[in-house]
């Protein structure tokens, strides 16, 4: 049995939610010794680039979460003049065609777009033969999430779920990984038609926030749907829409023929927020 197989098996045994809550406490504590130690060790381990952060002094952050969701200096991420830009720093995990309502995850693995978007067939219908992109944010990356194009918020769906780690080993070893983990589904209307933007949680992710609701994950373990069709929450391309308090993944879904990803954007391509992707 190889190392990756053992790692995946361990994911089923670890108390995922309890561990994530414990890490969440450390990430939110304002006790100087704890938060400064935590921040400095993390920044050194992952070689975090603080030169681009508005606050460069590690001890000036009130807690680890503030460091992890740090704001960047003006101009650090220019927004490309393109149909779509990357919503986050990270790397493309997978992208391409949604085949018969399923998105490719890894060799021999895929997941249902209906399940990804909370189990509602009507919500998923526009995307069943569309395009998707899965973008993984590594620990050292900038962890605010921005709009890939201008959009008007129509609906959000909090979907409770597991908290498997998200990495190549679990992508290859856990069936339907992204449709199993806790996630926040955000449905927008855009100039390209409907867009689903899914923020996926993972083990030790202390929370997911949106700019219109604050922290939305974790919530009580039942699905929650919010209707915004009467509201006027409009966000421009490149505007912040949310953030991760520790890790994970953003998935974009578009209808058939709505967008065409650039040829140079492929699996494992590194991305910077604001970079042209379509």
Locations of regions flagged by a protein language model:
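Contiguous, well-folded functional domains in the mature portion of proteins
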Residues: 1-278
């Amino acid at each position: 049995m190889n190392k990756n197989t053992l790692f995946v098996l361990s994911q089923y045994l670890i108390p995922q939610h309890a561990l994530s809550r414990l890490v969440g406490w450390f990430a939110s504590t304002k006790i100087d010794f704890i938060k400064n130690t935590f921040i400095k060790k993390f920044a050194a381990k992952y070689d975090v680039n603080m030169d681009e952060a508005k606050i460069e002094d590690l001890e000036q952050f009130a807690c680890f979460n503030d460091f992890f969701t740090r704001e960047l200096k003006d101009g650090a991420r220019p927004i490309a003049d393109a149909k779509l830009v990357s919503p986050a720093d990270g790397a493309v995990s997978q992208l391409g065609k949604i085949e018969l309502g399923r998105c490719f995850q890894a060799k021999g693995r895929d997941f249902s777009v209906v399940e990804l978007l909370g189990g509602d067939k009507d919500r998923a219908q526009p995307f069943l033969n569309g395009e998707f992109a899965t973008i993984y944010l590594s620990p050292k990356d900038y962890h605010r999430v921005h709009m890939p194009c201008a959009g008007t918020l129509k609906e959000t769906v909090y979907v409770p779920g597991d908290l498997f780690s998200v990495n190549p080993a679990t992508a290859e070893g856990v069936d339907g990984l992204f449709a199993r983990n806790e996630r926040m589904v955000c449905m927008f209307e855009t100039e390209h038609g409907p867009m689903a933007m899914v923020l996926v949680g993972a083990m030790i992710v202390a929370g997911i926030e949106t700019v219109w609701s604050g922290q939305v994950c974790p919530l009580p373990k039942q699905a929650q749907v919010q209707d915004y069709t009467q509201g006027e929450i409009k966000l421009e391309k490149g505007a912040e829409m949310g953030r991760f308090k520790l890790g994970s993944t953003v998935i974009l879904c578009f209808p058939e023929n709505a967008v065409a990803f650039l040829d140079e954007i492929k699996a494992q391509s590194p991305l910077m927020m604001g970079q042209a992707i379509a």
